Amino acid sequence: MEEFRRSYNRLCEESGAEPQEAVLQQLHQLPKGGLDLTTQSLTVETCRALGKLLHKETLLKELVLSDCMLSEEGSTLLFQGLCANTSVQHLDLKGNNLRATGAEALGKLLRQNKSIQSLTLEWNNLGTWEDAFATFCGGLAANSALRQLDLRNNQISHKGAEELALALKGNTTLQQLDLRWNNIGLLGGRALVNCLPSNRTLWKLDLAGNNIPGDILRAVEQAMDHNQDRLTAFRENQARTKILSKEVQHLQEEKSKQFLDLMETIDKQREEMARDSRASAVRVGQLQEALNERQSIINALKAKLQMTEAALALSEQKVRDLGELLVAGDQERQSLSQRHEKERKLERQEAADRESKLLRDLSAASEKNLLLRSQVDELERKARSQQEQLFLTKQELTNTSAELKIRAIQAEERLDVEKRRAKQNMEDLEKLHSKEVDHMTRHLEESERAMQERVQRLEALRLSLEEELSRMKAAVLSERGQAEEELIKARNQARLEEQHRLAHLEEKIRLLAQARDEAQGTCVQQKQMVAESQARVSQLNLQMEGQQRRLEELQQELINKDQEKVAEVARVRVELQEQMGRMQADLVAQEALREKVAALERQMKVIGSEHREALLDRESENASLREKLRLKEAEISRIRDEEAQRASFLQNAVLAYVQGSPLRALSPPK
């Protein structure tokens, strides 16, 4: 406030006037936020300086200028400074004898100032000049900040009340109006009553001491009560609305916090899922490689086992054939020995007879001996040819086994090619899956910018990712199944080809064995071959048992790996289900918040509808009261007209009586 005082001194010096000591003293004792110049006679220069100071002053809240006897020029200068002021809220101009110029300046002040809320104009003469007061009322109608107006003792007539009523129809902020001790009268009271239905903010109107009938005062009181009830309801509704808005804002903040927490949780879960998926992919790749290695080992062992089984079956068939040959040779030898014994007996019996014939038959026997020798030579040649044919058959069998091995190796190579192709397909599918995951991630980042649809889009994205993952898994499984089916088909085809070739070879061996039966000289060799075959069969049985044990161990390891893989998949599935459960719980909490907000909105709508119904009831009640008031006013006007007619009749009668009385003739002239 010291700055305010220095500015006042400077402005007075610039204008060439002496600062008023009383004003300086008040400025020195100036309380915080207020300036009280009550009963101080302010000069025009002081008013000019104060007007310039008030034009820029931002700390002054209250200005009291009561009983200062302001001149018209001084009041105009003060009001011009207050027009641009934005801090003064209470202005007291009591007892300043403001007239036409002051009323017009006040009208301009009310039209331009947006901060004054309380204006005291008691004991002035604003209503004496109707045009100036009309200007004041126009400023009041345009004002949107004034809450309290005191116009007591301002000589306001019924015309001024009519102008004031027009101003009240356009004003939407004035709440208290004091019009006591004026000259409003019946017509002014009616004008004010008629304007009250259009004004719903004025809840206090004092009209005492204005010669207004009691019914009009009661109507004014009813209107004020109605506005006060409306104001109370409005304040209650505003308080409820503020509480509800705070609650809604709090809920929105909580919702936003929860949503941010949910988004952070989802990001963390997404990162964890990405890490888990990468680790799972690495683990699956390692397991797949190990499985492929084990599968290749198993396939090699299976191929060896099949070859061993084929060799074993061939050896067993050879053993059976050789056994049959031995049995047939033994039977033939026994039959030959029996027949030889019979022949010897016959020869002994016929020895005597032969002795005589030997000499005769010697020449014939020698010839027969030569013939038999030639037959023996022929049989030996046949045996050698059979041995050569057997050697060729063995060589063909060796070539066939080598060809079978080559075909098995080719089948294994084709199997490896199919595995590599399946692995390449898996890698391509993983790359495609990673690209699709990147695309969906970018799509998720774009969709996160929309606050209202963020949860729904996130849910849809999660579902689509799960569906895509399930589809990719199904595709991988189907391709793996197809690869396994192709592998099985290739194995079956190779096995069928081997079986056909083995059957063909067995047929050849059977034919060769039947041809070999005719050779008697190979029995010892066949026995040796049987012994060797039995020893080889025992060795092959031992090797087969070892291979079976190895195969069982590999199968057990494969089962353990499958169990570990299933356990890992189950653990990942449980984690995903837990994450989905937490997300569903968050969604349920958000849905509860939405329901709570919807309930609050419904409650606000119910309160608004009740308020509207109450307003409609009050308006209907006001309409009925206005109708009753109109009827009462009509009746009162009729009674007043009758009373006026009676009074005029009585006055005429009295005048006629006075004019016709003898006392008038005796009265001296004036």
Swiss-Prot record:
Gene name tied to this protein: Lrrc45
Modification note: Phosphorylated by NEK2 during misosis, phosphorylation reduces centrosomal localization which subsequently leads to centrosome separation.
Keywords of this entry: Coiled coil, Cytoplasm, Cytoskeleton, Leucine-rich repeat, Phosphoprotein, Repeat
Name under which the protein is recorded: Leucine-rich repeat-containing protein 45
InterPro entries: Centro_Cilium_Assembly (IPR052116), Leu-rich_rpt (IPR001611), LRR_dom_sf (IPR032675)
PANTHER family, per database record: LEUCINE-RICH REPEAT-CONTAINING PROTEIN 45 (PTHR23170:SF3), NY-REN-58 ANTIGEN (PTHR23170)
Main location group: cytoplasm
Ranges where the record places region Disordered: 332-352
